[in-house]
């Protein structure tokens, strides 16, 4: 699963449930929770564009679509946030009322997502437990 598809899935869930933030829990094949991320959607398309630019070059038509999307604010900007401590994790989780669980992802997929999140965000992504 590419990071862009992953983002699209989460945004779809956030939009469907009319939430600005969504908690995603990632699991290894044996069912143990490996990572909990909060993905916050606000108005802009910058990070999604950055992620897509890192994967493949964009054609002129796609760039025009992105500029139009930025003007209309149709597409959300993704801000990844993970609490640094277990205490703050509980407080943080209480802020949001809807959770989406994308379970049974392979550990390789999880590592790939985690590494790409780190490389694409300014603030570090902290997981709740080690691999």
From Swiss-Prot:
Subcellular locations according to the entry: Secreted; Host nucleus
Where can the motif RxLR be found? 56-59
According to UniProt, the name of this protein is Secreted RxLR effector protein 45
Q: Which GO terms describe its cellular component?
A: extracellular region; host cell nucleus
Q: Where does the secretion signal sit in this chain?
A: 1-16
Taxonomy, superkingdom: Eukaryota
Q: Report the function annotation for this chain.
A: Secreted effector that completely suppresses the host cell death induced by cell death-inducing proteins.
Which family does the record claim for this protein? Belongs to the RxLR effector family.
Keywords carried by this UniProt record = Glycoprotein, Host nucleus, Secreted, Signal, Virulence
Positions annotated with a glycan in the UniProt record: 128
Q: What is known of its domains?
A: Has the canonical translocation RxLR motif, but lacks the canonical EER motif, which characterizes most oomycete effectors identified so far.
